[in-house]
Swiss-Prot record:
Protein name: Acetolactate synthase small subunit
Gene Ontology terms: cellular component: chloroplast; cytosol
Naturally occurring in which organism (per UniProt): Guillardia theta (Cryptophyte)
Pathway: Amino-acid biosynthesis; L-isoleucine biosynthesis; L-isoleucine from 2-oxobutanoate: step 1/4; Amino-acid biosynthesis; L-valine biosynthesis; L-valine from pyruvate: step 1/4
Family in the record: Belongs to the acetolactate synthase small subunit family.
Chain ranges of the ACT domain: 4-78
PANTHER family: ACETOLACTATE SYNTHASE SMALL SUBUNIT (PTHR30239), ACETOLACTATE SYNTHASE SMALL SUBUNIT 1, CHLOROPLASTIC (PTHR30239:SF0)
Length: 169
């Protein structure tokens, strides 16, 4: 199972290196990683997606707390969250294909951020499912390049779990 960990750290040099070193020593893979400042000066949030079981995540959490500059580690996998990713896609499209590509882009509420005679660069923001869906649909065209951010996530204060709502339909 994939686990999403939210880690608050002091914004000091070497913190990410120590975390990556811990994962490497234990043989764990980090599937997705996003780091950025929080609302508190000097504090950063690291959001990681780690494929592993519950027991291993518990051990990993304990190991993370032993590192310097780690303030809080939370497995938010089963909590109601808002999740987002950003993807940029460079798409080669002919003049003939452009209208169809733009229709798809509009349906997904994506944005064209650059265009030339033969290429579009598209910005897509959304939950991981939306990102995967538009990538699959646009694969009918020639995708020249793709870059994706790691997943970012915050726990919902409303406690509305949209994942469980989606399973009902």
């Amino acid at each position: 199972m994939k686990h999403t960990l939210s880690v608050l750290v002091e914004d000091e040099s070497g913190v990410l290196t120590r975390i990556a070193g811990l994962f490497a020593r234990r043989g764990f893979n980090i599937e997705s990683l996003a780091v950025g400042p929080t609302e508190k000066l000097g504090i950063s949030r690291i959001t990681m997606v780690v494929p592993s079981d519950e027991r291993t995540i518990e051990q990993l959490t304990k190991q993370l707390y032993k590192l310097v500059n780690i303030l809080k580690v939370e497995d938010i996998t089963n909590l109601p969250t808002v999740e987002r990713e950003l993807m940029l896609i460079k798409l080669r499209v002919s003049t003939f294909e452009r209208t169809e590509a733009l229709d798809i882009i509009n349906i997904f509420r994506a944005k064209v951020v650059d265009l030339s005679e033969d290429f579009l660069i598209i910005e897509v923001t959304g939950d991981p499912g939306k990102i995967v869906a538009i990538e699959q649909i646009l694969s009918k065209f020639t995708i020249s390049e793709i870059v994706r951010t790691g997943k970012i996530s915050l726990v919902r204060e409303s406690n509305v779990n949209t994942r469980s709502l989606l399973k009902e339909y």
